[in-house]
Amino acid sequence: MKFNKMVSSDRGKNRKRHFNAPSHMRRKIMSSPMSKELRQKYNCRSMPIRKDDEVQVVRGHFKGQQVGKVVQVYRKKFVVHIERIQREKANGATVYVGIHPSKVLIVKLKMDKDRKRILDNKAKSRAKALAEKGKYTEETMETS
């Protein structure tokens, strides 16, 4: 069921908005889940990925245990390039293989003051949501 009349549920329109999204929106779209340890530490599930984060590929051909550093976040193509994930072209040159951010797990964050502030805000709002969760009891339901 649709709750907001102003938001379209048309598949074609949503795809158009996704693939024609400006760079500042692509940053948000290109978020990656965080490892269990980071989730516990920061009380936050996912973060927009950035250069110098350490990630682990969890899906696809390159999945495995080795951890690599993000070399480039290629917003135009919705992919990230990771340190040791390369392939050889026909002419012998090596190129990075693009991997979608949803298929990697952030293992270590590159921290700065802005990112710290974002994590604090996310943790605060999550704590507030947990505090409000289940606040309706039988008495409050009967009175309304």
UniProtKB/Swiss-Prot annotation:
Cellular component terms (Gene Ontology): large ribosomal subunit
InterPro entries: KOW (IPR005824), Rib_uL2_dom2 (IPR014722), Ribosomal_uL24_CS (IPR005825), Ribosomal_uL24_euk/arc (IPR005756), Ribosomal_uL24_KOW (IPR041988), Translation_prot_SH3-like_sf (IPR008991)
Region feature Disordered, mapped onto this chain: 1-22
GO biological process, alphabetically ordered: translation
Gene Ontology molecular functions: RNA binding; structural constituent of ribosome
Basic residues composition-biased segments: 13-22
Key words of the record: Ribonucleoprotein, Ribosomal protein
SMART domains: KOW
One family name in Pfam for this protein: Ribosomal_L26
Family membership: Belongs to the universal ribosomal protein uL24 family.
NCBIfam families: rplX_A_E
Protein name: Large ribosomal subunit protein uL24
Taxonomic lineage: Eukaryota, Metazoa, Spiralia, Lophotrochozoa, Mollusca
Gene: RPL26
